[in-house]
Amino acid sequence: MNNLMKVVTGANTRMSYANVWEPKSVNGSAPKYSVSLIIPKSDTVTLDKIKKAIQAAYKEGEVKLRCRDGKVPPLSAIRVPLRDGDLEKPDDEAYKGAFFINAKSDTAPGIVDAQLNRIMDRSEFYSGVYGRASINFYAYNANGNKGIACGLNNLQKLRDGTPLGGKSRPEDDFSIEEDEDFLG
């Protein structure tokens, strides 16, 4: 893989739709590990690296992207993985003021903590944590769809965050009621 197409995101990247422990099938497709990476618009260093990696993947994938007439469509005319949360998910507070990328892999990502220790406890890495992601970009041309996709390599949890999209914890839903006599 061309190193120009590999990026490690900044420390304020938030993980959402984290299907990192078990692969998930979408609409009958082959099961994949995946995560949505929410990157603050203020993280211009990471966003610049991603834009350069997308450009490098486009250049390297020109043969794959070529149309029947021999022409390569401009980058602006094909699908790219970097999307604007304010435009595409305006009602989702987690995506406000951020870009996002959906990264996928056929193989499980390595998952480590801030000290690079492997995380084995599934409850430690969930939708809502903050950390870094090692991702790569590549061109694709499948079933008439052309674009640049994002592959998921590894993940690093740096800090906890409010869980996203999951159900609440029972400890948060209930309080201890000592005065009630449920049997009497």
Ranges and model annotations:
Residues 36-38, 102-104, 156-158:
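Residues in well-ordered beta-strands of folded domains
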Residues 112, 116-184:
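Compact mixed alphabeta submodule
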Residues 2-3, 12, 19, 27, ...:
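Detector for Asparagine
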Residues 63-144:
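Structured, beta-strand-rich domain cores
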Residues 1-100:
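OB-fold ssDNA-binding interfaces and closely related basic DNA-contact patches used
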